[in-house]
């Protein structure tokens, strides 16, 4: 769904791939790869895209059909990690359970929860399958405008 929404939002904004490429500092081919699913968009590029066009991450990932207007995302790995940990605890899951379900090492998942690394798009896609309801915007502590 993310790939489809990237293309849909670009087209709604009446922008060409080369214009998105210029904004994100990448090649046209890379933008095309993101939109077709050939390449996975890195989280930082996705955040830049969402911030540039005031897009909800929940909307981009297909968790909602409504694009709410949010404050820009400010990357705070520790806060994201704390929110991940809280989400897991509320749902009575272990790190091992979550890591196994999304097919990553427990240590890698632990690093996300401890704020050592920015969570990846691939990991977020996995979390969407585990948690319902789930909000990526909430995970990133985004505030509605």
Predicted features by range, described:
Residues 11, 22, 51, 89, ...:
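Alpha-helical residues within the helix-turn-helix
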Residues 25, 44-59, 122-138:
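DNA major-groove recognition helix of helix-turn-helix/homeodomain DNA-binding modules
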């Amino acid at each position: 769904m993310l790939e489809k929404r990237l293309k849909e939002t670009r087209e709604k904004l009446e922008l060409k791939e080369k214009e998105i490429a210029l904004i994100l500092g990448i090649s046209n081919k890379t933008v095309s790869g993101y939109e077709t699913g050939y390449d996975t968009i890195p989280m930082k590029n996705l955040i830049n895209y969402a911030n540039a066009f005031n897009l909800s991450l929940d909307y981009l990932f297909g968790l909602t059909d409504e694009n709410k207007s949010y404050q820009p995302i400010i990357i705070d790995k520790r806060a994201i990690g704390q929110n991940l940990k809280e989400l897991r605890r509320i749902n009575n899951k272990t790190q091992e359970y979550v890591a196994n379900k999304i097919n990553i090492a427990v240590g890698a998942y632990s690093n996300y929860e401890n704020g050592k690394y920015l969570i990846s798009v691939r990991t977020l896609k996995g979390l969407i399958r585990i948690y319902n309801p789930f909000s990526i915007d909430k995970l990133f502590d985004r505030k509605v405008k």
